[in-house]
């Protein structure tokens, strides 16, 4: 199979992609978070193709993407007042809501769980395709399972060429980190996966917002996509350092002693100024120190860049674990295998 990249799609191209999705083919779709690997969310055989292409365990739930909140009605058995408030305030956007599924939704989409994960993406091109397809689209990140998520069409092609039919190219993703996944119980919201919507943002709509205890467990069946098994990992071993630019630079110098070959460094501009003279360091600057949004935008992109350049070690500067930083540090923790140093 030759994978075709569709850039600047015509109306005929959108119709073709919608038809391919309805017919059970795999199409990579752009969103504001990362590129998704799309399949018909009502067709178990189509979703099996996702698991096969990604090498993803089938008990890992999928997110169904829909063009608007009205599309949720046939997919769930109930929508609470709290869930409706979240949709009204954060859709379209990087928020995934899990709700009791209807019989229309196959178990294959939920990993056998009684709740289905649903999201309306904040991406015009994606929503046009979803509307045209007329079906919910199951779409985990369009990468081989365990590797960094793709934020460009080329990233998708590098992992999925020959495994999927089409890639809809809409340029780089704006956010660069996956959606927040929540579960709603009466008037309480539980965060199953941190992401593009922060806890503080949710608290402007719902009074009680908590993190799920399973966020720190690897022993239970995942209730949300991306919360079990190895995720986001680069090819080289990775260590994250959180601290001032000076302490981060000093720690990088200590960790790099005796290392042969290029060392990938994901750093702020301030830290870069302190380590730029070391020729072993291949630096990717994400922005100013502590800028979680900038780090999130560049995180996966930098890991894939380091993979392409075959670095022997990756040293990354982390951020404070608050606000959007919670989502970033969650991804960094997983990518580094929990190798995080606080200075």
Regions picked out by a protein language model, each given a short descriptive name:
Residues 1-343:
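Active-site-adjacent structural elements in enzyme catalytic cores
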